[in-house]
Amino acid sequence: MKAIISLLLISAMVFSMIEAVPLEEGLQLFEGERGCLPHNRFCNALSGPRCCSGLTCKELNIWASKCL
C-alpha cells in the first residue's frame, strides 16, 4: 500500500515539473528543433527556400517573400 502511494506521489511531482515549463518556451524549443528562425519565420538556409507555417516548414513560392 505504501509503495502505491509513493508511486502516485512521485508521478504527481513529475507531472507538475513537466507542466511548469511555459507553453511559449516549449513552442520556441520545438521551433528550434524544426529549423525555423523565429525572428523572420523562415527555415534555416540548409532547408532551401522554405518558410515556417504553423508547426512545419513549407515550400516558399516565387510570389511569397515571407511566410504568413
Swiss-Prot record:
It comes from the Eukaryota. GO terms for cellular component: extracellular region. Residues 1-20 form the signal peptide. Disulfide bonds join C36-C52, C43-C57, C51-C67. One of its GO terms (molecular function) is toxin activity. Keywords: Disulfide bond, Knottin, Neurotoxin, Secreted, Signal, Toxin. Residues 21-34 form a propeptide. Expressed by the venom gland. This is U2-agatoxin-Ao1u.
